[in-house]
Amino acid sequence: MFSVLKMSGVRLKILPEHKTGNIIRNMQGEYMTEAGNNYSEKKTQLHISVRNLVEFIFREGDIDNRSSRAMSADAMMEGTRIHRKIQGSMGKEYQAEVPLSLVVEGDLYELTVEGRADGIFTEDGKCFVDEIKGMYRRVELFEKPVFVHRAQAMCYAYIFALQNNMETIGIQMTYCNLETEQTKYFREEFSFEEIKKWFDDLMEEYGKWATFQCEMKNQRQASIKELDFPYEY
């Protein structure tokens, strides 16, 4: 089982089902309950980026058409240029490169999920999280977004909606050809309940791997403690 802790500055808010009170980060960087107990005493601290998370769970084959050409320094520079050009064209209300993170608590671990949304903007009263992908593919032929790209945007959308108490949230997938600069967009909107269930299912899957990691670590540490060393120090 796991639960989500909202991260806001140096203070973490626990969702209603938790009964341990708010979590506070002290000057030493330790997480404490308001009662003064060390909350993370026996939890393994794990970290993963949003991109690595969704690629670990969903990736199937080549998602970015990363030929040697696409991985060249010139291609990476072109990708950065396209990102900035698209972000700059979206107007003053467009927030670019928004850092987002939260802590997901499992029985044996606390997992920090973090990354940067390419952009967040509001249109006609609706909020969208933008995920920009530059590539050499003919984007006009895309009939739907690449699944793992969509999952990345949905993770950011969930975190943003959670931390801002939003009832609905949208995602926009922006695909741009690096040579022609032709652009194609895909949009979806979700209720908070829909995107929360999606994220919960995602974390349930990753939680199996995280729990396995923690169990292996705990077994290894227990074995080390049982070793008899020939000399006392």
Which residues does each predicted region cover?
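Cationic, amphipathic, low-complexity segments that mediate targeting or membrane/lipid association
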Residues: 5-9
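Short acidic (Asp/Glu) and glycine-rich catalytic loops that position anionic groups and cofactors
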Residues: 60-66, 133-136, 178-179, 221-223
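Mg2+/Mn2+-dependent nuclease catalytic core
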Residues: 102-196
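ATP-dependent helicase/translocase motor core
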Residues: 166-233
